[in-house]
Curated annotation (Swiss-Prot):
Entry's transmembrane regions: 16-36
Pathway: Lipid metabolism; sphingolipid metabolism
Entry function: Component of the serine palmitoyltransferase multisubunit enzyme (SPT) that catalyzes the initial and rate-limiting step in sphingolipid biosynthesis by condensing L-serine and activated acyl-CoA (most commonly palmitoyl-CoA) to form long-chain bases. The SPT complex is also composed of SPTLC2 or SPTLC3 and SPTSSA or SPTSSB. Within this complex, the heterodimer with SPTLC2 or SPTLC3 forms the catalytic core. The composition of the serine palmitoyltransferase (SPT) complex determines the substrate preference.
Location in the cell: Endoplasmic reticulum membrane
Protein's organism: Rattus norvegicus (Rat)
UniProt name for this protein: Serine palmitoyltransferase 1
Subunit structure: Component of the serine palmitoyltransferase (SPT) complex, which is also composed of SPTLC2 or SPTLC3 and SPTSSA or SPTSSB. The heterodimer with SPTLC2 or SPTLC3 forms the catalytic core of the enzyme, while SPTSSA or SPTSSB subunits determine substrate specificity. SPT also interacts with ORMDL proteins, especially ORMDL3, which negatively regulate SPT activity in the presence of ceramides. Forms dimers of heterodimers with SPTLC2. Interacts with RTN4 (isoform B).
Length: 473
């Protein structure tokens, strides 16, 4: 039976061959021959190769020009013309051998040279040594780390806190720990560089809204809502985040947090709040922008801040609900793969928190000094003040740009140098021009601390005014 079936199939094949059109048979024959040629032919013929003569080799070597390892850099680049600081960058700072009043370092509460903070750091140094030599998951967790996390959570009135060993890596690690490919992040166009790097690492879909423009943010949220209605299945697994700063590092302006919270609940998004500039500055007790507006901390999904400004230490922290913070212990890159915070710096931060809790009036003092310098700098010829009157890091920008960023920076640097010659230490705000998503205009940054006297604030304003007139007029 099987033999009969095989014969029948063979007959059908022969019959199909006879009935096939001629062009079909020709095409199949050509393809078969081409495949045979590919299988048996060589990729190149040895006889076609010819060796270069010694003279030709020398000519090629002489003509070859290697590409530069790094791009060309101007001799006037700030990184090649740095100032040298001698001693701690406290209230008075010695720059290039000249003593100046410090209006450049982010020592807002003046705790960098506080005797109690230094004593706590020294005691920790004697007990633990300098570093930990390992990440938190590998014998890098010391009892002082747990104490600091507990104190930060208690101070911020959240369930839990987590500390990082470097301030920049805090928000840059926290964002990609939650926001992944396919998620959508709505972020302010003036977001600081650390936020930008976190967004880049997350590989999420980034939507920029105009700086502090709630209407523009709502427009983007509405557009996304319409897109979600077209594909409900995808929308169910797509998370939406709003990322903002309490006080913006690049502009000195405060975020409209009440409006952001309203949009959060209306469009079912999560809020990440970066408070490096507002922690220890805003609010009656220094808890940041949530306390400033009287908003419940539970309305914010994640708060991050560094400890390198108000706390005068190093590192950063995130705080929020326990399940949110615990996720970072497994997914926060800067937490899992970096050596933990040196214990002496954790001890210093704890003592700084003690001082903040014992002396809440310090925040009102800082606010008053910020308002004083903000008012004193109004009307400086050729310069405009950018930032809120309650921000301790103001920006002075040119009223009218020359049309060249390099030229603008050169003019501002001349003002900085003239002020330094008169005993006022300032600095320009520095950016990685080619990597910034929205590059801010050149500016001089003026930093206020509680240690500066009213006389020094007025003197600084007068010095800036004189330097601006000399350079710009």
């Amino acid at each position: 039976m099987a033999t009969v079936a095989e014969q029948w199939v063979l007959v059908e094949m022969v019959q199909a061959l006879y009935e096939a059109p001629a062009y079909h048979l020709i095409l199949e024959g050509i393809l078969i021959l081409w495949i045979i040629r590919l299988v048996f032919s060589k990729t190149y013929k040895l006889q076609e190769r010819s060796d270069l003569t010694a003279k030709e080799k020398e000519e090629l070597i002489e003509e070859w020009q290697p590409e530069p390892l790094v791009p060309p850099v101007s001799r006037n680049h700030p990184a090649l013309n740095y100032n040298i600081v001698s001693g701690p960058p406290t209230h008075n700072i010695v720059v290039n051998g000249k003593e100046c009043v410090n209006f450049a370092s982010f020592n807002f509460l003046g705790l960098l040279a506080n005797p109690r903070v230094k004593a706590a750091a020294f005691a920790s140094l004697k007990k633990y040594g300098v570093g930990t030599c390992g990440p938190r998951g590998f014998y890098g967790t010391f009892d002082v780390h747990l104490d600091l996390e507990e104190r930060l959570a208690k101070f911020m009135k959240t369930e839990e806190a987590i500390i990082y060993s470097y301030g920049f890596s805090t928000i840059a690690s926290a964002i990609p720990a939650y926001s992944k490919r396919g998620d959508i992040v709505f972020v302010d166009s003036a977001a600081c560089f650390a936020i930008q790097k976190g967004l880049q690492a997350s590989r999420s879909d980034i939507k920029l809204f105009k700086h502090n423009d709630v209407a523009d943010l709502e427009r983007l949220l509405k557009e996304q809502e319409i897109e979600d209605q077209k594909n409900p299945r995808k929308a169910r697994v797509t998370r939406r985040f709003i990322v903002a700063e309490g006080l913006y590092m690049n502009t000195g302006t405060i975020c409209p947090l009440p409006e952001l919270v309203r949009l959060k609940y209306k469009y079912k998004a999560r809020i990440f709040l970066e408070e490096s500039l507002s922690f220890g500055v805003l609010g009656e007790h220094g808890r940041g922008v949530t306390e400033h507006y009287g908003i419940s901390i539970d309305d914010i999904d994640l708060i991050s801040a560094n400890m390198e400004n108000a706390l005068a230490s190093v590192g950063g922290f995130c705080c929020g609900r326990s399940f949110v913070v615990d996720h970072q212990r497994l997914s926060g890159q800067g937490y899992c793969f970096s050596a933990s915070l040196p214990p002496l710096l954790a001890a210093a931060a704890i003592e700084a928190l003690n001082i903040m809790e014992e002396n809440p009036g310090i925040f009102a003092v800082l606010k008053k000094k910020c308002q004083t310098i903000h008012k004193s700098l109004q009307g400086v010829s050729g310069l405009k003040v950018v930032g809120e009157s309650l921000c301790p890091a103001l920006h002075l920008q040119l009223e009218e740009s020359t049309g060249s960023r390099e030229r603008d920076m050169k003019l501002l640097q001349e003002i900085v140098e003239q002020c330094m010659n008169k005993g006022i230490a300032l600095t320009q705000a520095r950016y990685l021009d080619k990597e910034e998503k929205c590059l801010p205009p050149p500016s001089i940054r003026v930093v206020v601390t509680v240690e500066q006297t009213d006389e020094e604030l007025q003197r600084a304003a007068a010095t800036i005014r004189e330097a601006a007139q000399a350079v710009l007029l």
